[in-house]
Amino acid sequence: MKIYLVGGAVRDALLGLPVKDKDWVVVGATPQEMLDAGYQQVGRDFPVFLHPQTHEEYALARTERKSGSGYTGFTCYTAPDVTLEADLQRRDLTINALARDDDGQIIDPYHGRRDLEARLLRHVSPAFGEDPLRVLRVARFAARYAHLSFRIADETLALMREMTAAGELEHLTPERVWKETENALTTRNPQVYFQVLRDCGALRVLFPEIDALFGVPAPAKWHPEIDTGVHTLMTLSMAAMLSPQLDVRFATLCHDLGKGLTPKNLWPRHHGHGPAGVKLVEQLCQRLRVPNDLRDLAKLVAEYHDLIHTFPILQPKTIVKLFDAIDAWRKPQRVEQIALTSEADVRGRTGFEASDYPQGRWLREAWQVAQAVPTKEVVEAGFKGIEIREELTKRRIAAVANWKEKRCPNPAS
């Protein structure tokens, strides 16, 4: 029995990155020998065991053979005669097909170290094409390591295009697509994930609402980058710099979906694209089974982001109604989230990356003012039932009006 550290832990250690999870491969052992050594079996489809002390995963070396469609259509073979090289060959990328033995020696049969040094994401073997989920995984790795200047090897991108064109991605379940997307959205450069999907044709298959934005022009005065798809990825990049929150990043990604519905004869203007985009956000989220809290914020951002940009000319009544509409009284975090997505929208434009966004500050300040109006005083004044809410709204509007006159005057007044 020989045990090797494999995959991501070896890769990240060689890159000088923190190692989070460790995966191990056991060569020359049977399931019974693992159980006798105190390991606990947890794998259902193939033998995976938990270490009795560390609870890290130890998998018996295995090979895989394509036996059906999609990413689940594989038959696994596990036996003591399966070599480490055979186990590593089934992995997706050469940089993930690395192992380290007890003495610290690196086993690298597929030149993963060379590709690490060259900053290349390259597939190990033609078997890559048998698993459509790998298209998304490579896009996610491209996003994860973009800050280290990694790129996808030409032959790997070509294979990803072939897989997409062959309809392989249609076998992916919504849950797996969303899981990879969720992980990609939390990387330092989530926009790279969607750019890679577009480069191989997968964006049109998996995210048609986003793909439809490419080639749709916006007024050059407000959008020097012109293309709405380009703007969308720029705003996502900016959102990633502004916030680590998945909610903020996903909502920013979806903020302009409505522009994909604008008839060509009305280009480059997109009046009413905010409310129009709400249905597309709903459609995308329903198809991929996106969590409800992410969906709800994305719908609000789609509908109201342009309103936030006009904050200086908003009436106090409109501002308080906005807080009602986003349910800020029960979910106050939404004020900050919407301020951030709106800022990402403005700064996600060519030449505007370093722009100040005072509207975000004013939105936050107005919220603090409105929130500070005491409900207790309204109740103690004798108001009852629906009168309490009506009086509270009046007092909030008055408080915001007083604040706005001092801190955020209407430029037209």
UniProtKB/Swiss-Prot annotation:
Mg(2+) binds at D21, D23. It catalyses: a tRNA precursor + 2 CTP + ATP = a tRNA with a 3' CCA end + 3 diphosphate; a tRNA with a 3' CCA end + 2 CTP + ATP = a tRNA with a 3' CCACCA end + 3 diphosphate. Its cofactor is Mg(2+); Ni(2+). ATP binds at G8, R11, R91, R137, R140. Magnesium is required for nucleotidyltransferase activity. GO terms for molecular function: ATP binding; CCA tRNA nucleotidyltransferase activity; cyclic-nucleotide phosphodiesterase activity; magnesium ion binding; phosphatase activity; tRNA binding. Catalyzes the addition and repair of the essential 3'-terminal CCA sequence in tRNAs without using a nucleic acid template. Adds these three nucleotides in the order of C, C, and A to the tRNA nucleotide-73, using CTP and ATP as substrates and producing inorganic pyrophosphate. tRNA 3'-terminal CCA addition is required both for tRNA processing and repair. Also involved in tRNA surveillance by mediating tandem CCA addition to generate a CCACCA at the 3' terminus of unstable tRNAs. While stable tRNAs receive only 3'-terminal CCA, unstable tRNAs are marked with CCACCA and rapidly degraded. Monomer. Can also form homodimers and oligomers. Comprises two domains: an N-terminal domain containing the nucleotidyltransferase activity and a C-terminal HD domain associated with both phosphodiesterase and phosphatase activities. This is Multifunctional CCA protein. It comes from Salmonella paratyphi A (strain AKU_12601). The lineage of its organism: Bacteria, Pseudomonadati, Pseudomonadota, Gammaproteobacteria, Enterobacterales.
